[in-house]
Amino acid sequence: MNEAQRKELANLIDKFSSGNGIHSTAITGVNCIKLNEINDRLPSVYTPSLCVIVQGKKRVLLEDEIYQYQPSEYLVASVDLPVIGQVIEASKDKPYLCLQIELDLHQLTELMAQTRLPFKNKIPNQRGIFVGDV
């Protein structure tokens, strides 16, 4: 995602988020997340989803591992996971903005079967959560 695309997505998330919190969109399973301030560590269970940060920074703890991600990076949770999340960069002028897309594992499995693409596991023994660049 280039800088112009990131800014455009940030403007859209800000526009469709009336205040702090998770905001549903007209598309089922797609949510906009906005926070105007950093928060304390918040225990929760991440469900299978893809989260793309477009503004701000977040830290997620899974047992003894720390996953930190920032604009133009994403976090994927592939299974239900007990984590502790914390937004570590946000303000009223530059709120934390994130696009969350829920993953339907049943649909993904069907899609993989229909495409008949070969499965290549290049990373053995990986956790059910990972961060990458958009």
Predicted regions and their residues:
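N-terminal regulatory/effector-sensing and dimerization cores
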Residues: H23-N121
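A short, N-terminal "cap"/entry segment at the start of jelly-roll beta-barrel domains
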Residues: M1-A26, N39-D40
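Amphipathic alpha-helical segments enriched in hydrophobic/aromatic residues interleaved with Lys/Arg
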Residues: N2, L111-V134
